[in-house]
Amino acid sequence: MKTLAIDEEQLFLSKTIFEEEVYGEGFSIIAGVDEVGRGPLAGPVVAGACILPRGKIFAGVNDSKKLTPKERGKIRDILLNDPDVCYGIGVVSVERIDEINILEATKEAMAKAIANLSVHPDFLLIDGLHLPHKIPCKKIIKGDSKSASIAAASIIAKEYRDDLMRELHQRYPNYGFDKHKGYGTAAHLAALRAFGPCDCHRKSFAPIRQVV
């Protein structure tokens, strides 16, 4: 167990290299930013922004896609209940996605998440996208697997969006949103063919246009 704890600590520290580089440049409050839900056919796109306290270990923090739902939920609870962790969430609706396209909606969700931080960051580490912003920032490809703060943001955003999709399942039980979270699985596509799209489907996405 001790070896496992040491391994998890080292893994976390290996994901703070980008943060430490930015600290070395004189910045002091670094927020990681990531989005969840660009690809699904239904539901909003959600972004998370997270500021982790420097020097504090959060074992298990990793790319949300590499964690089981149980692991992800546990780490989310640890992050949200830690008084030294600051986080913000941004949500952009299906209607807005259809209006401005998913890329611009993703950027809008990220900007909202940053604005919803209770502490003002002086530097942003952003997963995969160049985000025009007044705060200095750095784009990191696959940042959710390389940066602890981006990984934390991805976990928070993923859990938040999954909760939203479970709520949508209560309103629209025919589609199985609680299982696939809006992604284009075979079961989801079959439901679309059987029932047609509902209000929370993205009408601008090709698979939805084909059944409208």
From Swiss-Prot:
Residues 28-212 form the RNase H type-2 domain. InterPro entries: RNase_HII (IPR022898), RNase_HII/HIII (IPR001352), RNase_HII/HIII_dom (IPR024567), RNaseH-like_sf (IPR012337), RNaseH_sf (IPR036397). It is found in: Cytoplasm. GO terms for molecular function: manganese ion binding; RNA binding; RNA-DNA hybrid ribonuclease activity. Its cofactor is Mn(2+); Mg(2+). GO terms for cellular component: cytoplasm; ribonuclease H2 complex. A divalent metal cation binds at D34, E35, D127. GO terms for biological process: DNA replication, removal of RNA primer; mismatch repair. The keyword Ligase does not apply. It catalyses: Endonucleolytic cleavage to 5'-phosphomonoester. Manganese or magnesium. Binds 1 divalent metal ion per monomer in the absence of substrate. May bind a second metal ion after substrate binding. Its main location: cytoplasm. Keywords: Cytoplasm, Endonuclease, Hydrolase, Manganese, Metal-binding, Nuclease. The keyword Nuclease applies. Its EC number is 3.1.26.4. PANTHER family: RIBONUCLEASE H2 SUBUNIT A, RIBONUCLEASE HII. HAMAP family: RNase_HII_B (MF_00052_B). Endonuclease that specifically degrades the RNA of RNA-DNA hybrids. Belongs to the RNase HII family. This is Ribonuclease HII. It comes from Chlamydia caviae (strain ATCC VR-813 / DSM 19441 / 03DC25 / GPIC) (Chlamydophila caviae). The lineage of its organism: Bacteria, Pseudomonadati, Chlamydiota, Chlamydiia, Chlamydiales. The gene is rnhB.
